[in-house]
């Protein structure tokens, strides 16, 4: 029996708002002492009333537009009722039947080919508190930190259009890239700002028979998503072949063991007893609202990747490296400033030397200390023959440390190459006179000897000889007949 794997994803992403979803508490809780970013609304105290965060709504709509969703003019919030220690009110304010965004799609690349996954909905809700599990003196405790409670959260639900663990990983990476480009989420999985539950099932390749799905939780990295889905794919297929009965369930991924385990029976919408949130008004969105939000959107990653290849003549891999992050793509375009002839050199410098500097210092391109105009200046100094490529690479670190323009550093440190032919010709003649053996070797056919002679010329000028000019003058002198 031949199987086809069917995968759908439910992705949660925290929004980068200053305040929480329904109150004025700071949403930036990272590193804060437990239970310090809280108020009566966060804690679900009786009598407290929520107020909608307008910016969170705008960010959700922007995400929906980027994913090609339809934005209904009317939306509302609902109460999702369930009891859990991380939910102080006993319900979560979410959206049920009238979400902000519906019927979209995301295109991404798999082995260089476009794949399209439909987006069922994007809705807005509040995050829950965080549970911290500890064991002290043999006793187990679960502590509750309410700082995360009420942070704006979007849930992006796909249709079951994915068919392999690798596709699921690539989709998630592309989705996170879009969210980061929009500036609506950090997308940092290690901080819980980008989380995913994966639904996976099996069906026959002809679609005539399909088995119940399993929802996998505890996926805290892209690698975990791919590994967990690969394990569950094999587990389900093996169970079917053995004639076992599969049930719809929620399973947890155990990273250290590389397996999924049963947690509970899968919930259904009726289990949550959704009903409209009575303390919040509905949301009405006009065409003017959508036009304003659309006007604030940047060019999206896939479109920019394609444009870089067409406009700047870059290869797919170069364009992918440059467009992986919006800040890097912006830096590249600011450096090139419309001059296509600089594109290749700028791409090489950014993906080579500048990326190496960023890795060394553990920072992003906006913190590395080099401005786009400074990198362009460095490239132009090399192209004009003012400095060598080696000197330019050394200067890049100095620019990063001091913020000083390359032209100023070249002047201050006397790094300009000697390109004057009269001056170089005199030194060439002296070097040839002082090294008759190397000259004889070259004239006997040992052309590698010119490297030694070039080194002597460079040494005489403290490494500032223009290598191209010096080599040409050496070759001309060596080809002269012996007197």
From Swiss-Prot:
Superkingdom of origin organism: Bacteria
Reaction catalyzed: L-glutamyl-tRNA(Gln) + L-glutamine + ATP + H2O = L-glutaminyl-tRNA(Gln) + L-glutamate + ADP + phosphate + H(+); L-aspartyl-tRNA(Asn) + L-glutamine + ATP + H2O = L-asparaginyl-tRNA(Asn) + L-glutamate + ADP + phosphate + 2 H(+)
Name of the protein described by the UniProt record: Aspartyl/glutamyl-tRNA(Asn/Gln) amidotransferase subunit B
Pfam families the record matches: GatB_N, GatB_Yqey
Family recorded in the similarity comment: Belongs to the GatB/GatE family. GatB subfamily.
Self-association state and partner proteins as the record states: Heterotrimer of A, B and C subunits.
Keyword Methyltransferase tagged: no
GO molecular function, one term: glutaminyl-tRNA synthase (glutamine-hydrolyzing) activity
A GO BP entry: glutaminyl-tRNAGln biosynthesis via transamidation
PANTHER family registered for this protein in UniProt: GLUTAMYL-TRNA GLN AMIDOTRANSFERASE SUBUNIT B MITOCHONDRIAL AND PROKARYOTIC PET112-RELATED (PTHR11659), GLUTAMYL-TRNA(GLN) AMIDOTRANSFERASE SUBUNIT B, MITOCHONDRIAL (PTHR11659:SF0)
Lineage: Bacteria, Pseudomonadati, Thermomicrobiota, Thermomicrobia, Thermomicrobiales
Gene name linked to the record: gatB
EC top class named in words: ligase
NCBIfam families: gatB, PRK05477.1-2, PRK05477.1-4
Record keywords, A-Z: ATP-binding, Ligase, Nucleotide-binding, Protein biosynthesis
Organism: Thermomicrobium roseum (strain ATCC 27502 / DSM 5159 / P-2)
Function per UniProt: Allows the formation of correctly charged Asn-tRNA(Asn) or Gln-tRNA(Gln) through the transamidation of misacylated Asp-tRNA(Asn) or Glu-tRNA(Gln) in organisms which lack either or both of asparaginyl-tRNA or glutaminyl-tRNA synthetases. The reaction takes place in the presence of glutamine and ATP through an activated phospho-Asp-tRNA(Asn) or phospho-Glu-tRNA(Gln).
